[in-house]
Amino acid sequence: SHATKTATITPPVGEPWEESYDIIVVTAGAVTRTFPIPGVADQAIGMKNIEEAIAVRDRMLTNFEKASTLPAGPLRDRLLTFVVVGGGFAGVETYGEMRSFASSLIAQYPTLTFDDVHFHLIEAMGRIMPEVSLKTSLWVIKNLEQRGAPVHLDTQLTSAVDGKIELSTGESFESDLIVWTAGVMASPVLSNTD
C-alpha cells in the first residue's frame, strides 16, 4: 500500500510477505504495442529483442529462397515485399539494415534483381526520427529512397489481414514480412497496479 509504504511480494512458490520501502521502482519491461489494426497482432514481427531480429532475418532468407524458384508474379512479389511500420530510430535502423541484407541476398540468387525487391516504411507522422533535426530526417529519407527503400509519411497502416497491406492513402499490396516498430507499452504485469 502506498499509504503505509509496503509492498506484498508473492513468489511463484512459497508464502507471500510484506516488504517496506521508501521509494519503489517496478521494472517489468515493455511489450510491443500494436494498436487495434486488423492483422497486425497475427502478421507482424516486433523488433524488441534478438529473437525477433533473428525471426526477421530467417523470414527474409526463406522468402528469397522461395522467390528464386518462382516466375515473376503475385506470389513472388508478396515474398519479396518487406514492410516496416514505425519511423522512429528502431524502425529506420531496421529498415536500412533489411534493405542492405536484401542487396547482399540478391547477389546469391541470379534469378532475382534489385528491382524485384520492394520495401515500404510506413510512418503516421509527417517525418521520421522526431528525435533528430528535420534536416537530418530529410537526409535519411533521401538516402533510403536512393537505395530503393521508399518512405510513406503521413500514412497509417489500416489493415494487414493475411498479409494484405492496406494504407490510409488507399494504396494496397501484399507482403509476407511486416516488422512492427511503431511503439511499446508497459508490460501487462502492471495492468492491475496503481
Describe these PLM feature segments.
Residues 1-4, 99-194:
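A Rossmann-like FAD-binding core segment of flavoenzymes
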Residues 1-81, 179:
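FAD-binding core/adjacent interface of flavoenzyme oxidoreductases
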Residues 29-32, 95, 184-186:
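Short glycine-rich anion-binding loops that position phosphate/pyrophosphate groups of nucleotides
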Residues 30, 88, 125:
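Short, flexible active-site-adjacent loop segments at beta-strand->alpha-helix junctions, enriched
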Residues 33-34, 91, 128, 188:
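Flexible, glycine-rich phosphate/dinucleotide-binding loops
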Residues 52, 90, 156:
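Residue-level recognition of oxygen-bearing side chains
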Residues 54, 92, 130:
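Loop/helix-junction capping segments adjacent to catalytic residues or to phosphate/diphosphate-binding pockets
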Residues 58-114:
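Rossmann-like NAD(P)H-binding beta-loop-alpha module
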